[in-house]
C-alpha cells in the first residue's frame, strides 16, 4: 500500500495526532525535580488572564444573626493582567529511507509508519521537557521565558505583581570559624520571613525544598553544623551513604540540582503546599482542527514533504510556567549574598 494512502488515514489527522501525543500511556510524563509542584491549567483563549489576588484568601465581614451579611467594602479594583504563552517546538522529517527500512512484505502498514513517527516524536518530547524544566525554574524566580532563555515577562515588575527582586540570603558557608548554631539561626529567620510574606494563617507552607547548585550543596553537606546533625542520623552517618542524596536540615529539604539555570554557589528556596502558588498554563494550538479547544501540553501536525520525499511533522507546545507569589521566593548564596539580605 502506498504511503500516501496510509497517510490519508484518520489516524494521521492533526486532531488524532494531538490525542496520541498526549496519551500518557504511550508517552509517559517525565518526572523532573520541579514538575510535581506545578498545577496545570488548560485555556482556550490566546491570552491567559492572571488575577493578582488569586493565591490569597478573601477577607470576611461581621454581620448580625438573621440578616444578610453586608457587602465587603472594596477600596481598589481587583488587579488582573494578561500573558500570551510562547510557542516552542521543532520540525522533523520522516524520510524515505526510514520508511523503507520498516517495510513488511513489500508494503508499508499504518503501524510501521506510526512506529517511526512515535520514536521521533518521543525524542522531541524529551527536548520539550528539558525546556519545561528550565522554564519552571525561571517561573519560580518570577520570569516567563522562551526557548532561547530570553525573558518575555518579568512578573516582579509594577505591571504585574509589583514586587522587589528576589532577596538573596548569604549563608556564609565558607566562614573560617562559624559561630555554633549560626546557620540554624539564619534558616529559622528565613522560615519566618517567608511565612510572613505568605501571610501565615492564610497560606502556610507544608515544607520547603531548596534546589541548590552543586557547589552550594557540597559546602552545606560538609558544613560543621550539618555534619553534627548527621552524626545523630544513623542512615546518613554510615560511610556507604551517597553524598549526593537529598537531606533535611533545619526544616529545609536540600537537593543537588543537576539541571541548568542556577549560578555557581546559588540555590532557590521553594515553599511547598500553598494552593495555586505555582502554575503551568497551556495555551491553545494554532491549528484549525483544534481551534477554540482547551490547550494541550503537546501539539503535532503532519504534511507531505516537498516532491513526495517523505513527511514533515511539527511538534509544539504553548506554555507559561509561573509563580503567583514571587515575593515569597528567596535565593541562597554560599557566601555573603548579593544584597546582604537579613530576613
What are these regions (language model features)?
Residues 1-46, 324-343:
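N-terminal alpha-helical "arm" segments
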Residues 5-28, 151-184:
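Hydrophobic alpha-helical segments and helix pairs
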Residues 21-24, 186-194, 281, 285-290, ...:
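Short, Φ-rich (hydrophobic/aromatic) sequence segments
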Residues 34-104:
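Assembly/oligomerization interface modules of large self-assembling protein complexes
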Residues 85-164, 192-214, 218, 309-316:
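Long, contiguous amphipathic alpha-helices that act as assembly "spine/axial" helices in icosahedral shell
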Residues 184-238, 243-246:
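Ordered core of a single globular domain
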Residues 224-343:
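Sequence/fold signature of self-assembling virion shell proteins
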Amino acid at each position: 500500500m502506498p504511503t500516501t494512502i496510509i497517510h490519508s488515514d484518520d489516524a494521521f489527522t492533526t486532531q488524532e495526532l494531538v490525542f496520541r501525543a498526549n496519551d500518557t500511556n504511550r508517552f509517559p510524563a517525565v518526572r523532573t525535580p520541579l514538575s510535581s509542584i506545578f498545577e496545570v491549567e488548560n485555556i482556550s483563549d490566546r491570552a491567559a488572564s492572571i488575577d493578582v489576588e488569586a493565591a490569597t484568601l478573601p477577607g470576611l465581614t461581621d454581620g448580625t444573626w438573621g440578616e444578610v451579611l453586608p457587602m465587603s467594602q472594596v477600596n481598589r479594583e481587583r488587579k488582573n493582567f494578561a500573558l500570551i504563552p510562547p510557542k516552542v517546538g521543532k520540525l522533523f522529517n520522516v524520510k524515505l529511507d526510514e520508511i523503507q527500512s520498516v517495510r513488511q512484505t513489500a508494503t508499508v502498514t499504518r503501524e510501521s509508519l506510526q512506529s517511526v513517527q512515535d520514536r521521533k516524536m518521543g525524542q522531541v518530547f524529551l527536548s520539550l521537557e528539558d525546556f519545561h524544566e528550565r522554564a519552571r525554574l525561571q517561573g519560580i524566580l518570577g520570569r516567563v521565558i522562551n526557548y532561547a532563555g530570553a525573558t518575555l515577562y518579568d512578573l516582579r515588575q509594577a505591571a504585574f505583581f509589583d514586587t522587589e527582586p528576589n532577596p538573596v540570603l548569604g549563608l556564609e558557608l565558607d566562614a573560617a570559624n562559624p559561630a555554633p548554631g549560626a546557620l540554624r539561626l539564619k534558616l529559622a529567620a528565613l522560615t519566618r520571613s517567608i511565612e510572613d510574606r505568605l501571610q501565615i494563617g492564610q497560606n502556610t507552607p507544608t515544607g520547603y525544598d531548596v534546589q541548590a547548585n552543586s557547589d552550594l550543596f557540597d559546602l552545606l553537606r560538609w558544613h560543621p553544623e550539618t555534619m553534627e546533625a548527621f552524626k545523630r542520623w544513623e542512615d546518613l552517618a554510615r560511610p556507604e551513604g551517597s553524598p549526593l542524596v537529598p537531606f533535611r536540615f533545619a526544616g529545609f529539604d536540600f537537593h543537588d540540582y543537576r539541571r541548568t539555570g542556577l549560578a555557581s554557589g546559588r540555590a532557590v528556596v521553594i515553599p511547598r503546599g500553598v494552593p495555586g502558588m505555582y502554575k503551568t498554563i497551556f495555551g491553545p494550538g494554532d491549528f484549525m482542527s483544534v481551534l477554540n479547544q482547551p490547550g494541550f501540553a503537546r501539539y503535532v501536525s503532519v504534511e507531505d514533504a516537498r516532491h513526495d520525499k517523505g513527511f514533515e511533522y511539527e511538534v509544539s507546545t504553548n506554555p507559561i510556567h509561573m509563580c503567583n507569589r514571587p515575593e515569597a521566593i528567596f535565593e541562597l548564596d554560599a557566601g555573603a549574598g548579593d544584597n546582604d539580605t537579613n530576613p
